[in-house]
Amino acid sequence: MRKKQKLPFDKLAIALMSTSILLNAQSDIKANTVTEDTPATEQAVETPQPTAVSEEAPSSKETKTPQTPDDAEETVADKANDLAPQAPAKTTDTPATSKATIRDLNDPSQVKTLQEKAGKGAGTVVAVIDAGFDKNHEAWRLTDKTKARYQSKEDLEKAKKEHGITYGEWVNDKIAYYHDYSKDGKTAVDQEHGTHVSGILSGNAPSETKEPYRLEGAMPEAQLLLMRVEIVNGLADYARNYAQAIRDAVNLGAKVINMSFGNAALAYANLPDETKKAFDYAKSKGVSIVTSAGNDSSFGGKTRLPLADHPDYGVVGTPAAADSTLTVASYSPDKQLTETATVKTADQQDKEMPVLSTNRFEPNKAYDYAYANRGMKEDDFKDVKGKIALIERGDIDFKDKIANAKKAGAVGVLIYDNQDKGFPIELPNVDQMPAAFISRKDGLLLKENPQKTITFNATPKVLPTASGTKLSRFSSWGLTADGNIKPDIAAPGQDILSSVANNKYAKLSGTSMSAPLVAGIMGLLQKQYETQYPDMTPSERLDLAKKVLMSSATALYDEDEKAYFSPRQQGAGAVDAKKASAATMYVTDKDNTSSKVHLNNVSDTFEVTVTVHNKSDKPQELYYQATVQTDKVDGKHFALAPKALYETSWQKITIPANSSKQVTVPIDASRFSKDLLAQMKNGYFLEGFVRFKQDLTKEELMSIPYIGFRGDFGNLSALEKPIYDSKDGSSYYHEANSDAKDQLDGDGLQFYALKNNFTALTTESNPWMIIKAVKEGVENIEDIESSEITETIFAGTFAKQDDDSHYYIHRHANGKPYAAISPNGDGNRDYVQFQGTFLRNAKNLVAEVLDKEGNVVWTSEVTEQVVKNYNNDLASTLGSTRFEKTRWDGKDKDGKVVANGTYTYRVRYTPISSGAKEQHTDFDVIVDNTTPEVATSATFSTEDRRLTLASKPKTSQPVYRERIAYTYMDEDLPTTEYISPNEDGTFTLPEEAETMEGGTVPLKMSDFTYVVEDMAGNITYTPVTKLLEGHSNKPEQDGSDQVPDKKPETKPEQDGSGQAPDKKPETKPEQDGSGQAPDKKPEAKPEQDGSGQTPDKKPETKPEKDSSGQTPGKTPQKGQPSRTLEKRSSKRALATKASARDQLPTTNDKDTNRLHLLKLVMTTFFFGLVAHIFKTKRQKETKK
């Protein structure tokens, strides 16, 4: 007797805890603890909320709020800067402070000069729309409230009344207005992101701060309007809420509005009309809206580079995609304020190095350290007791490295990078163990240094960064989904120190941190222009400020690639407030629309025409040239790096005073086209900058980015090809099984969003026991108690007869999948539904079914909005989407089941890019409702317990599975298991069944049922007792029960789930495609499978095999029970799975999709895990 094991409930509890964590995901924007140390590709995931970054592994706290993971290798924040809670500082008049500000030490954007010209924003109001704020932080302070726009609460109330605003509160002199527009009545869970953003824009910490340096925002003397907006009732409602906040900010006198949040890859065209009107309203009133570009890098997320065949890999979404906004990318400057440590080098020189700490080391104390390799083995730590362990990054998680060091007696850990020029990474907190991350260069210095001591300094300093000046790898690329140029400009967004909740300070990274700096600069520049250009209207000053700011930005250069970073990544370049403030010239496109040039489709040769504007009273002599570049390709993927092609020669031009003049630069890239098309067959970008200097020996004065596409950008394919067409069985998000390339397992216990990401048709496999219950009149499947599960599978896939844990594509002779359905209402292969991996945003998706004459017999409802599947790292960003409206149940437009035959299932959609034409993808689908005919009699031998049927089944479609099912009670759960046929076609019936607790249950003959299923999902089943009764010589009784005298039903009903027919090579001859034996004359020609060929080949020919190399339905263990205790453990689980069909996400409402996904993960995971453990145990025991 095989001994069975009890369920591992300890593991089940852990799994449930994990599920609970996932569902309670509320990102808190502070530094996410890094838990992984495995290198990953340099991308990120955007959530529809504020854009701070979690820069190593995605945290379970990222589903809802601000942070968005960076490229799995970088740091989010520096908790070492946290302060203990303090009483908020007074917001009234305070003497000028003498403590140095962070900007005094490091000002890469050169803001101080502009601050002086514009009085640091005194007398102005700025608005921040975000997820939450700490209204009591010490940084909310005015130096002189007599210069404030709103002198009192009464002044605010008067302004509110003038504009019909009946809500919002006065907080203090600094925070003139606060209101929660989310209308959810809850206190904001996340207060940190908005607090951090507001500090960058307008923080003004007092000199009494415990920080070594004082926080001062770009506009420290401006008053704040804090407006909380969070997703509560869907994205559309969310957009309407922040639209109302925009209108109120404008009416309350805001000079600039910062919006550091976004919905990746969403198109501006899909925003509600009231949101678009709010943007237009702000523009008309001269109010600048500054948005963050997002932290999603590009199509593919943090683990995958975009394919070189699909150049539309930009993911900048809304609201950043709006033309009227100023959209900001993130870059890391060459110097950074950082914690430091000092070592004595071999020549006795002090060497300072930047460190990023988690749980700080004691300052000014000399620590001994010892090298511990990669911190994996016990031997690595033989010398670390009482010392700091110096460990190289790689191989295992940071958490494990730190835990191993602690176990070995180390007093702390230093982990150094395994990559040159990498960004710093915050390490996880492991039992409060002091730990710090350092660069590879410094780590190697420590390793080789003979003096193994290090001292951590108390005061942070400005030191060069290991990465140098570089675009942040998480920063989202353009173009937008609409095909427009974004981002507009770049600003520092890497490890930015600012205010966070509870009167603390921390470093965060993300485009959320870049945007408020630019917002502050825009506010200061507009205030300067009020004096400089008093005759201009506010909207004219806004337009000029945006163009000047972009023109005066410095195009960032990639020293590694010897080329400028792409305009699709950096926009016009790094913001430079000093240059903007002093600028008397700027450059725009030829129509003076904006300071960027979008050429759309171009050929090998084209021209770039720009307009140079001179607002000074003197003529200006300039030199200009253009850089020409494209994308670098690495194998089959874009490297997300620039590739320089050439530069034009410098030319000279003179611009008259107070005038403008056009400049045209001819570009000829024809000599590169052959090689570039070989790497990027569907086209490539030709882009760069037109740069201007006043003197060839001096720095760039101004520049303008241009972008063209060599090809037809609008008509690039929107949908990835179906998985059925893949030569190696893989897709962008799906790795093929190396042993069986056509293996496509169904959803099973693992929710599909976590694995099956490709383009295909789905259907549903309903187990025999459920079908039987339905046929016997059970109307509500929730009332069915069964060990089996209704499972979503892929049309054209079938399981092995003895193992339904894996599904494989079964193909016609022409290579197309055998996608067949039987729409008879039994829930087994009754429908097909479209699932797609979209490479681009599309609109007006509709499915239709055509008969063989090309007539449309059915059309689905329209899905108006389709968002590209840009990432599959989290449940909130899927690698594919299932479209519920495309579900076809085999009926025509009048609701009648169509005739048996082959139909074309067509999915039509149109990319949203300008000039795009409609595209479509076709699938062949067989409809067949013909019920299998089975034997009406059988014999049973009590000697060897073999059941022999009188004849083989006759089917219209090939036989998928021929089995004996038996059902018994395992405790209180009805349990079904199956017996596959022996090689001679007989079945060996067991005398007893084993329970999960190791006991046995005796089986009666009435427990057995003969079940036949064809590849369209038609099922016939007959009790074995009826088969025995049908035999002329009644069989010997088995002692368990009497054979009933009722005759078997002639034509039982059907079902299906999918696989090649059960063929027995040694039994000659077997049935042909008609389901009849070859020696019997068929009444008509064999029915065909829709491909024009007879479905079933004769058994004497070699059986078809799937990609696993096995014949579908072949039974390795002769006549043994196939213990397929399927995946359902209770009626509740079955009901959950059934209802899940109507909850699968579509692209209509992404935040709703997220809620659906989270709920489904929890509900299906628990019940599925229980049943999965049952099934796994049984299958292992069967194989023993």
Swiss-Prot record:
Active site (record annotation): D130 (charge relay system), H193 (charge relay system), S512 (charge relay system)
The Sequence repeat ranges on this chain: 1034-1067, 1068-1084, 1085-1101, 1102-1118
Record-stated family: Belongs to the peptidase S8 family.
Phylogenetic placement of the source organism: Bacteria, Bacillati, Bacillota, Bacilli, Lactobacillales
Residue positions of motif LPXTG sorting signal: 1144-1148
SUPFAM superfamilies for the chain: PA domain (SSF52025), Subtilisin-like (SSF52743)
Gene: scpA
Organism superkingdom: Bacteria
Role noted for this protein: This virulence factor of S.pyogenes specifically cleaves the human serum chemotaxin C5a at '68-Lys-|-Asp-69' bond near its C-terminus, destroying its ability to serve as a chemoattractant.
Biological processes per GO annotation: proteolysis
PANTHER family listed in its UniProt record: CEREVISIN-RELATED (PTHR43806:SF11), PEPTIDASE S8 (PTHR43806)
Pro-peptide region(s): 1148-1184
Keywords noted in UniProt: Cell wall, Hydrolase, Peptidoglycan-anchor, Protease, Repeat, Secreted, Serine protease, Signal, Virulence
Protein name in the entry: C5a peptidase
Keyword Protease annotated: yes
Native organism: Streptococcus pyogenes serotype M6 (strain ATCC BAA-946 / MGAS10394)
